[in-house]
Amino acid sequence: MPLRHPRPHPVDGSDEQGPVSRFARLAASCTLLGAALLVLQFRSAGEAVPLRKSLDAFPVAVGDWQVQAAASLDPEVLNLLKVNDYVLQRYVDGGGRSLWLYVAYWATQRGGAQIHSPQNCLPGSGWEPVEASKLVIPLGASPPITVNRYLVQKDRSRQVVLYWYHSQGTDVAGEVQAKIAMVKNAFLNNRTDGALIRISAPVQGTVQETTERLIRYVQTVYPILGEYLPD
């Protein structure tokens, strides 16, 4: 099934990708990866940065959403990810509509540890992308954040997935942007800590209705994330 890039919530014109644009992005990613490896090699003495408090203490109630289940990652997955702390919980609202919150934190991305993009992990678990776009989510008094939005499908099941990266008080959507932030922070602050925030929900009602529910959840949970993730 071809991947579609819907236009209802565009950020800018950057999602128009021809062959040259895709090649340029790939080249930029490879260059940044090489730079990141050099930084991590020559500045290996940087300290691991702890969370403000453990994600084990993440609230069981977020607005009108209540935790119904919590899950643990397999030891093999943990060994692959080299994540320092995470929370993976299923929340349900009063209408019985559910979503999954996954927050993973790396105190350092040295020694082979690095954030794994859902763009790669979702197909590996059988979820194929159908639509991809970026959304700008307003946060009231705080600046808005840009997140990735994916519609994925496995057999006849569909999910909407929102995710973004957090590093030292900055939120970015793109993998390249996240690498740039890591390299910059490694040079300036000798820090490579970072987090991945992913929120997903099965399509209940229409895709747009499901997306809007996730947006409202992001707006509710975002201030709570600041109590855990370091600046």
Region locations from a protein language model:
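N-terminal Lys/Arg-rich, disordered targeting/topogenic segments
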Residues: 1-17
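Hydrophobic membrane-insertion alpha-helices, especially the h-region
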Residues: 25-41
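Bacterial N-terminal signal peptides that target proteins for export
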Residues: 20-24
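Short extracytoplasmic
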Residues: 58-90
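A cross-kingdom signal targeting lumenal/periplasmic-facing segments of multi-pass membrane
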Residues: 88-216, 220-224, 228-229
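Short beta-strand-initiation
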Residues: 53, 84-86, 145
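Alpha-helical transmembrane signal-anchor/signal-peptide segments
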Residues: 44-62
